[in-house]
Amino acid sequence: MISKEKKQEIINAYGRNANDTGSPEVQIALLTERIAELTEHLKINKKDHHSRRGLLKMVGQRKGLLEYLKKTNLEGYRELIARLGLRK
């Protein structure tokens, strides 16, 4: 679970303003953070298949948002994956 402070930091870093929670850049950054936390959880709890299913759902959601961003704003897409350290 992402704390309020961490979530606000991500929104400030990737959003267009402090209240921008809906832009694809912010959504992708938040999903990336949640995926990283859940990945760490699953390294410890290998048999937690319910969380694994949620992780796969989040990865798919992020993939769809990345495809949308690539289609609508190619330069923003390239910048975002470089900042987040995603491979594409």
UniProtKB/Swiss-Prot annotation:
The protein's superkingdom reads Bacteria
**The entry's keywords:** Ribonucleoprotein, Ribosomal protein, RNA-binding, rRNA-binding
GO biological process, alphabetically ordered: translation
**Annotated GO MF terms:** rRNA binding; structural constituent of ribosome
Gene3D superfamilies according to UniProt: 6.10.250.3130, S15/NS1, RNA-binding
Q: Which GO terms describe its cellular component?
A: cytosolic small ribosomal subunit
List the residue ranges forming a coiled coil, or say none. none
**Cited InterPro entries:** Ribosomal_uS15, Ribosomal_uS15_bac-type, uS15_NS1_RNA-bd_sf
Q: What does this protein do?
A: One of the primary rRNA binding proteins, it binds directly to 16S rRNA where it helps nucleate assembly of the platform of the 30S subunit by binding and bridging several RNA helices of the 16S rRNA.
Summarize subunit and interaction data from the UniProt record for this chain. Part of the 30S ribosomal subunit. Forms a bridge to the 50S subunit in the 70S ribosome, contacting the 23S rRNA.
NCBIfam families attached here?
S15_bact (TIGR00952)
Family, as annotated: Belongs to the universal ribosomal protein uS15 family.
Protein name as annotated: Small ribosomal subunit protein uS15
